[in-house]
Regions:
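Conserved beta-strand-loop-beta-strand hairpin that lines the nucleotide-binding pocket
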Residues: 1-6, 52-140
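Helix-loop-beta hinge of the Bergerat
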Residues: 3-34
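Conserved short strand/loop->alpha-helix "switch" segment adjacent to the catalytic nucleotide/phosphoryl-transfer site
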Residues: 23-45, 102-104
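Short hydrophobic/aromatic-rich motifs at helix boundaries and adjacent loops
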Residues: 20-26, 37-38, 81-83, 92
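Hydrophobic residues in the alpha-helical elements that line and stabilize the ATP-binding pocket
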Residues: 47, 51
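Conserved catalytic core of two-component sensor histidine kinases
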Residues: 17, 37, 41, 114
Length: 140
């Protein structure tokens, strides 16, 4: 039986450190090494910061549900929110080859999530809001 780790927090930026600690515990307990754990922490931090900033538009009364689970040789993180709908197809790809002086500030969160994780999937339904599922393969 897979071990599940669950955390529910309100949508305040101050919760990001609590989320990072939760992810570290769940990832290390599931067999991820230090580098893999760091990748997951960074991806989840980006995702949750985006939920707070964009889905809830900075409102502190939103809810973020995070579930982590080891499934075979994969570590699966699901992040659920009930904020404004997110459509990743509407996010322009960052121009990472442009000089820094010509780049916009921000806009790299989705790019980083996809680089750090092995799978990234977004879903939305009117009844259950936004659901982000990210997978990291567990390597020894």
């Amino acid at each position: 039986m897979a071990e599940k780790y669950s955390l529910t927090v309100d949508s305040r930026l101050e919760r990001l450190s609590e989320i990072a600690n939760f992810i570290e515990l769940a990832a290390r307990s599931s067999g991820l090494n230090e580098d893999q754990t760091y990748d997951v922490q960074m991806a989840v931090d980006e995702a949750c910061a985006n939920v707070i900033e964009h889905a809830y538009r900075g409102r502190a009364n939103g809810t973020i549900d995070i579930v982590c689970e080891k499934r075979g040789k994969e570590f699966v993180v699901t992040i659920q929110d009930f904020g404004e709908r997110f459509d990743p197809k509407k996010v322009a790809s960052p121009r990472t080859r442009d000089p820094l002086s010509k780049r916009n500030i921000g806009g790299l969160g989705l790019f980083f999530m996809r680089k750090m994780m092995d799978k990234v999937k977004f879903e939305f339904s009117a009844g259950s809001g936004n659901r982000l599922t990210m997978v990291k393969k567990i390597k020894k």
